[in-house]
């Protein structure tokens, strides 16, 4: 049996459809169509959980730290941009607890998450997606801090939002402690991530 492919004209249509229709996996909405994302790699998942544990250890409530499951609506800035992302790690604000009781989706009408981290997968397409496209989309919704975690280079790039664009706080290598503007209390060395 062939199913008709559904096209959406708004993000709200997609949300309504996905609330009412059982869907397995994660999907990005690109040009009105659902595009299934591949499962996360074990490495990406492991890195996200390691970071979660460190944030919880410094007192961030566990219900605010979400590895890989939080959907974030983003503006479409370039042709073929996704209208939503599933970052490898999202740190929510307290007010999100009330706003996401029914569905773990941060929409454009909500305050942005405090931090988003992406584990960069190999390949130019993946690097461009994380370093260029997602960076611009997360800045556009006002995410104060964006981390790019690169397992190949064994580095963490920390970006802090200044105005409408990100400023590079630093690229931290193996022995370095990560400098977070949003979470000054954080004590995390890059080697703890990899």
Q: Which residues make up each language-model segment?
A:
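Gly/Pro/Ser/Thr-rich low-complexity, intrinsically disordered segments predominantly at protein N-termini
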Residues: 1-194
């Amino acid at each position: 049996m062939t199913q008709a492919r559904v096209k959406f004209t708004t993000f709200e249509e997609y949300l309504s459809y996905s609330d009412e229709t059982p869907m397995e996996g994660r999907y990005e909405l690109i040009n009105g169509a659902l595009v299934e994302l591949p499962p996360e790699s074990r490495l990406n998942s492991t890195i996200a959980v390691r970071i979660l544990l460190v944030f919880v250890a410094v007192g961030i409530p566990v219900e605010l730290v979400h590895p890989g499951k939080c959907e974030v609506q983003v503006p479409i800035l370039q042709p073929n941009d996704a209208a939503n992302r599933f970052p490898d790690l999202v740190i929510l604000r307290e007010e999100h607890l009330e706003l996401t009781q029914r569905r773990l989706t941060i929409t454009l009408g909500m305050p942005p998450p405090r931090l988003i981290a992406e584990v960069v997968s190999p390949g130019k397409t993946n690097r461009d997606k994380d370093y260029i496209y997602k960076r611009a989309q997360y800045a556009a919704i006002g995410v104060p801090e964006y981390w790019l975690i690169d397992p190949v280079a064994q580095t963490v790039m920390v970006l802090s939002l200044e105005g409408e664009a990100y400023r590079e706080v630093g690229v931290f290598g193996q022995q370095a402690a990560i400098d977070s503007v949003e979470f000054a209390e954080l004590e995390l060395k890059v080697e703890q991530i990899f």
